[in-house]
Curated annotation (Swiss-Prot):
Origin superkingdom: Archaea
Modified residues (N6-(pyridoxal phosphate)lysine): 216
Protein name: O-phospho-L-seryl-tRNA:Cys-tRNA synthase 1
Gene Ontology biological process terms from the UniProt entry: translation
Function: Converts O-phospho-L-seryl-tRNA(Cys) (Sep-tRNA(Cys)) to L-cysteinyl-tRNA(Cys) (Cys-tRNA(Cys)).
Enzyme class: transferase
Keyword Protein biosynthesis attributed: yes
Organism, as annotated: Methanospirillum hungatei JF-1 (strain ATCC 27890 / DSM 864 / NBRC 100397 / JF-1)
EC number: 2.5.1.73
InterPro entries xrefs: PyrdxlP-dep_Trfase, PyrdxlP-dep_Trfase_major, PyrdxlP-dep_Trfase_small, Sep_Cys-tRNA_synth_arc, SepSecS/SepCysS
Amino acid sequence: MNCGEGIDSRQIDELFINLDPIQAGGRLTTDAMKAVLAYGDGYSVCDHCTKPFRLDHISKPPLAEFHRDLASFLNMDVARLVPGARRGFQAVASAMVKPGDPVLLTAYSHYTEFLSVEQSKGTAFEIPADESHIITPDAAAARIEEVIKTTGKTPALMFIEQVDYQYGNQHPVSDLSKVAHQYDIPVLCNGAYTIGIMDVNGKELGADFLVGSGHKSMAAPAPSGVLATTSEWAEKVFRTTGIKGDLTGRTFGVKEVEMMGCTLMGVTSVGMMASFPHVKRRVKEFDAQVQYVNRIVDALLTIEGTKVQSEYPRKHTLTRMNTTDSFDTVAKTHKKKGFFLTSALRERGIAGILPGSTRVWKFNSYGITSEQADYIAESFIEIAEKEGLVCSR
């Protein structure tokens, strides 16, 4: 089946167990797929948009209620839909950072966090990670003191990853927030890999701003995401327009400046909303998903020379492995070179690991079943033994 001239249909999740690091949490639910068909036309949610003409006030489909439910789900006061987590970072930086302001990020901050600071003409300062690839409160405090001493300014904002994209490690956001707040620095918690995957309580984390990704972790079409904040900061980050045309005298009602007015006007918002009941249920099952990924990692570690670079035992399904001393030794003489591993996995119905990777690579097992976890674990061992690697199972 083709989707149009030259566009093949995509069947990766129908034909394979997909371990792609960034795709696992964004697989659509059946309800979201129905929403894609029903609301695929451009401004499809605008059929019943009436005064004050803003997305978060639309009652049919129930987007106004969805905005309130999202805020409650995250234990924050106000939430808005945004076109991906990056637009949440951008909105907060635009509201909080002035030219020349120092801004704290971490050694594992996503590039879009840096770009949001750059666009606001702030200056980026990174908090280093420790040897375990964790951002610690002590490191944050030391970096804050250093930045204040060298710039003469208190950082305008601190970005913290709840789970980072490089190692899939959980960082002590609550403790980091306490450190930042001692210096009156507001905190943006990046929950791109957690919101929609596991329970996230923004106020318990001490987050002033909480950003999530719909298409990465909330079973939603791309680009979609959420930006939530507390009542303390809502008026600032969701400020309404005050501009006026000098010739026409036009004004623009209650459009929010950092949101650029309405954000997700069609299939993205309804797809995200359609998946939401499923998302609320699945975050309660995250512990089982962690058990499954640990089964896979345990199996990989029986292959001599294999190391896990993420914290272990795993606390999240996104995982970074180092097989330089195992699978990469095979790649040096194999006729398929580094592609032998992903080729062998694909023959077994497993996809998603970067083709050619036999040294350092990531996978994300979120959404698999217990049986699939056992199958993946056994597949890695079978491939290793077939290629002459020693396994201690």
